[in-house]
Amino acid sequence: MRIIPFSEFKDRIASGEIVKVVVGSPYFVGYTSARPAPSARGFSLLSEREAPTYHAIGVLSDSFLSMLDERQVVYSIKPRERNYLIETFQYLFPLLILFFVWRFFFKRMASNVSGLGSSIFSAGHARSAAVEEGKVTTRFADVAGVDEAKEELMEVVDFLKFPKKYTEIGGKIPRGVLLVGPPGTGKTLLARAVAGEASVPFFRISGSDFIEMFVGIGASRVRDLFKQAREKAPGIIFIDELDAIGKSRLNAIHSNDEREQTLNQLLVEMDGFDNTTGLILLAATNRPDVLDPALLRPGRFDRQVCVDRPDLKGREAILRIHAQNVKLAPEVDLKAVARITGGYSGADLANVVNEAALLAVRSGRAQVIETDLDEAVEKTMIGLQKKSRVIREEERRIIAYHETGHALAGTFTKGADKVHKITIIPRGTSALGYTFHIPEDDRHIVTEQQLLAEVDVLLSGRAAEFVAFGEVSTGAGNDISRATDIVRKMITDYGMSEKFQNVALTRRGTGYLAEPQLAREYSECTQQYVDEEVARVLAERYRAVVALLTEKKELLEYIATRLLERETIERDEFEEVIRCEHDLEGLKKRLSQQQEGASAPAQGQSPPS
């Protein structure tokens, strides 16, 4: 068989060489007529099978068939060979594609609904993170700064370990303990410590995990959670962010049928607790004021344990725990760090230690020094240093006098916090400089004198600008806003005005956060008085601060000039300047002599050859 082009194939048909054609798809086979072939005995006729054949690939058309008829060529059309396997696959392939696409989306939807399995029928299963007995490694020794809360929870641990001691005498352990406190204070850590100390299974779930798109899922998950816990009792169920499902049902505006069904099921399950099973429910929230009263009644959450921000002693203990895994230099004073981190939670302090370790690595040191911790505190409190920010010299002078005014007012105003640091290095998004004040001790109440002293310190930045330059700038915008808020609260919240003495003009919530309510319960005349009284007090305090800084103008100019040269003045240097207030010239001479003495050895060294 010889393969030829289709055009040549047609030419051989036209010449009469091809006398028979078999039409396939898409090929053509042409057979020639049998003709004699030479042999040893002469000529012999070739059979049709032995006759030359031609093979071509082309397209069957009406003109080609007409040509075959005209040439009286015998032709036949060979039926197409059918491959049943391929045909079956061609029919089934689209169906298989649709099936796999449907299965993919069905599994994804079922997974989103249930969070556990690939079946939509598992949507009602609880999405709790169960930790087996003995696998919770957290202990009370890992928790610091909340000693009172630990004492309350130690009783829960004792019940889980020795339940008969309580049941034999007829006592009942609280069925539920609600941990209340601001974010980051260690509520979840305390719950894990209880489970770790008692060596019992620990079931942890978030309040938002109960609510999904299908009605009834929340109640089903509550039932499943308590069923799992009872099977492994004694144990602890911990619900984080309880306010997600426990909001009060009294507010019809924010009512939600699915959330109410979930809450009702939770109340039923808590009523069904058996005091002898050793199953205790712990929950945490930072919004106890929005919880439903039925949830807080005795027999459900019997105890509310306040987990507040730590005091000075607690902050030091927390820092020591987090510093156990960090290489600290011997001279690091964690108590000093605790003193400047007033109001920090346990999570904030952990972040400070971690940031200090990262700063030490960035600087190429093998240990964390005190400077790293100070920088970490300022970074978490104010923001990152912006050393690359370009500030005009005129603006730097305004900032220097502004911050010096804050520092002097904080020093010479009775009741103000002491100055820890002054700097004109920008930080964060808006701080072009700042004066770091720290209280001597933690405060739980604030006197009227201390509030007015804080107002004086806030207004002293603008007052310093006025004393130094005779005009003010927008740099004191945030200070004025904060001072206005303090004075307004003194009048409306604390009853510290002459006309409305001992009268609170605003209502506050009754919960832990005591959020102010938006409703105003006083007249327009009272509002006018409040506005006028705020303006009067601020004007009076501003005049007093201007008088103070005018009296201390020489000291103001000296510290501001020093601040422009060095950019940062620490507490020790600032206090030395204050002590030498009446001998600034002598202080200048001593400082210049110290600088000359420090530079003399460097000048006496011979240059390297």
Swiss-Prot record:
Its membrane topology: Single-pass membrane protein
GO biological process: one example: proteolysis
Transmembrane segments: 84-106
Periplasmic side stretches: 1-83
CC cofactor note: Binds 1 zinc ion per subunit.
Compositional bias segments (type: Polar residues): 592-609
Positions in the Cytoplasmic compartment: 107-609
Binding annotation for ATP: 181-188
GO molecular function, one term: metalloendopeptidase activity
CDD domains: RecA-like_FtsH
Keyword Isomerase: no
Residues that hold Zn(2+) according to the record: 402, 406, 479
Chain segments carrying region Disordered: 590-609
One Gene Ontology cellular component: plasma membrane
Cofactor: Zn(2+)
Domain of life: Bacteria
Catalytic residues (positions): 403
EC number: 3.4.24.-
Location(s), subcellular: Cell inner membrane
Zinc is among the record's keywords: yes
Assembly: Homohexamer.
Family stated for the protein in its record: In the central section; belongs to the AAA ATPase family. In the C-terminal section; belongs to the peptidase M41 family.
The name this protein goes by in its record: ATP-dependent zinc metalloprotease FtsH
UniProt gene name: ftsH
